[in-house]
Amino acid sequence: MADSREENVYMAKLAEQAERYEEMVEFMEKVAKVDVEELTVEERNLLSVAYKNVIGARRASWRIISSIEQKEESRGNEDHVSSIKEYRVKIEAELSKICDGILSLLESHLVPSASTAESKVFYLKMKGDYHRYLAEFKTGARERKEAAENTLLAYKSAQDIALAELTPTHPIRLGLALNFSVFYYEILNSPDRACNLAKQAFDDAIAELDTLGEESYKDSTLIMQLLRDNLTLWTSDTTDDAEDEIREGSKQESGDGQQ
């Protein structure tokens, strides 16, 4: 007998507590692939957190290995560089597999089944996030360009709905603005567009702060703080390595929470 939806959700929560995120992904994928009804807010957040942790560990590994590779290259240690490159390529294969998995699920199930503006923006933002993660490490000009174009398309689709349907203080709309601005800054090397987008989102939210409901107050104000942190970083005379401190969404906010 197939596992019930409730049992898979429970097992996903259990896996999260045990920090077994690959298994958490498996349980939530089972839930997402059942075409009975779309995911609840709790279920989509569980899926998001599962994938965020699985991809986050590899993204961190890739950054560390890439940094070591650059240092060894500058020292002329060719033997070490060769070994490091092999290891980096292995991590990149894992990153690609993870991104392909969630992007396939978004394409086949999650985006088509989304019935509310909130869920549509949530999943389109998620789609943009995982295309962005591909763009972070793809070195081939064609592959990187394709990943960047797909990111832009998904974020713009999400933005169109968010601006029309969600309030400026909605955590999912704010989370989208946060990650979209990071994309402009890091992937497209467009600091002006990044700052404009982040500032507009922050200012629009500030103007309607008194309408913010208690339930989303914590999530919304956290993302606003991250937007402000990035604006401070991007508009100050910082060194290149300060980019490492660019802030994205937190672990488990309503706005998906990618980093």
Swiss-Prot record:
GO biological process: protein localization; signal transduction
SMART domains to which the protein is assigned, alphabetical: 14_3_3
Biased composition (Basic and acidic residues): 247-259
Superkingdom, taxonomy of origin: Eukaryota
Tissue: Leaves specific.
GO cellular component term, pick one: cytoplasm
Region listing for Disordered, in residue ranges: 237-259
Signal sequence region: none
Family (UniProt): Belongs to the 14-3-3 family.
Protein name: 14-3-3-like protein
Organism listed in the record: Solanum tuberosum
